[in-house]
Amino acid sequence: MELEELTLALESSLRSEQAYYSDLVSHTVHADSNGFLDGYSKTLYSVGISVVTEDKATTGLNTGRKQTDGWFSSARFWDKLESLESIADKACQRTLRKLGATKPTTCEVPVVFSAEMARSFLASCSSAMMGDHVFRKQSFLMDKLGELIANPQIQLSDQPLLSGMLGSRYFDSEGVIATPLTLIEDGKLVNYMLSTYAGNKLKMKSTGHAGGISNLVLEPGKYTEEELICSVDNGLYLTSMSGQGVNVTTGDYSRGAQGLWIRDGKLAEPVSEFTIASTFQQMLHNLDLIGSEVDTRNPILTPPFRINKMSISGT
């Protein structure tokens, strides 16, 4: 496969774990007893690679270990995919930057979330805005409509009608017509996402969210990712999270993490085997800088961002 050849040619120590290409055409039709009958078709193209290399560090956490990473591109249309050269370069760099990781010291520092990690955070956040969690009293955002729950610069919405985006749809899984919905406006929670059942429980109308989000959009800011990193004298660039320490009922947030340490505004050594911790409430208020470059490979459309203080538990 050409992508595999391009990637392995960049660094002799790399070995391919998987390279793939897929294309898909799907058709959705919904009919119900209320007389609704409609449908639509959509396409999806995806190409990617994951690679592995041995970590030859003689000291530190990675001694004798293998490091793996990769990159992929997904889009509704084939001509919107990233070039194979770009995918190969990112897969190579993302893997090599993990070599020789150390464990950071325990501290409180700013954390820059890569777009992928921003997406993970917003996915958890959005579940707290779903009506089924709210009426079951399993959301830290219960009874918070109209209140300031986040930094006033945050604008978050669900946008089902965006052209070419992966979460776009004309109706939800109950046949309710999809319309744009503002969730957070100037930091205030203004809507929940409701199915018909959840809406009835909360004495509200369905917002067309049976089946979950469509395209969840965090409005971009003005900073490049490099500028976000430059804004931090001593902190973390977060590239990976693991574990299940997320509680949308209480708002507690604790995840295993990997990343790169930021020193004097520049990426320094890789770090791993530590946890980051805070609460959703604090993180939303402390999310103070938002990037400009949106990752469109997922229905959660978000740029990277900075949270100005989180706890790091390391050595």
Walk through the language-model features, giving the residues of each.
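Active-site bordering "gate/hinge" segments
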Residues: 1-169, 176, 185-188, 266, ...
